[in-house]
């Protein structure tokens, strides 16, 4: 019997210098990298897993966006959805100032559209209203506004980078057709994650972004003033990889795959299985809190 042993040789420690270091090569991380590279910055992404994609590659639906050019290619027939949302806002969230204000604005927009029904009806405020109701009213209104107000621009940005999500359909949590999905050469709707991630990776390669796989960041480096100036990571053979940078971007997602951390913040989820990618271990949160960052809503966990 011959035993084949894995190569246990430890690689040499290394140091890389860049303008920007990004932790996590999922959809957010690669988007940030492409954007920074487009501004002439040198970019390094540190990714703990052997492949890019994170949770994004697991997404099978599409991307929600309001007031897009692709929505206008559809005939509007979702009056009942709008009416139901306005009724829900009035009956269940009358004491929520944000939802009440959004519902008032949407009611005015809806009345104006009914008086002159041109194009496809949707608005940033209706998307905000749907999102606030979907979050049971505990969402951060400012973050919801940022998400919704920039959603159409995000669809346009993807288009500019050869990633087209032009099939618009209905989906849970939306009053109108708002989910944008990719279509293959045969005209069949396909999973957004497996479509988008390879194209984002291709854009990273074209932009000269360096992606370090199997490299787990475990410390944010700071200067004497407390400013983030890089990260320290561990490579696949245990070697130390130091990335010095002028800016650090954390796009590590949550901690749904770290069951100990899940139970710590929400004990009733003990024993639950997760749909998260293996890399969702909460490293980014732990690194950030180690240098003084605060946390919020830690019990709101995507399992």
Walk through the language-model features, giving the residues of each.
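Glycine-rich FAD pyrophosphate-binding loop
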Residues: 38-59
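Beta1/beta-strand and adjacent pyrophosphate-binding region of the FAD-binding site
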Residues: 11-28, 44
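Glycine-rich loop(s) and the adjacent beta-strand/alpha-helix scaffold that form part
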Residues: 236-239, 243-303
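Gly/Ala-rich phosphate-binding loop of Rossmann-like dinucleotide-binding domains
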Residues: 33, 37
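N-terminal, intrinsically disordered, polar/charged segments of Gram-positive cell-envelope systems
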Residues: 2-13
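Short, solvent-exposed loop/turn and secondary-structure capping segments
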Residues: 54-58, 68, 75, 170, ...
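Conserved redox-cofactor binding core of oxidoreductases
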Residues: 120-239, 258-261
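N-terminal glycine-rich dinucleotide-binding loop that anchors FAD/FMN and/or NAD(P) in oxidoreductases
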Residues: 58-93
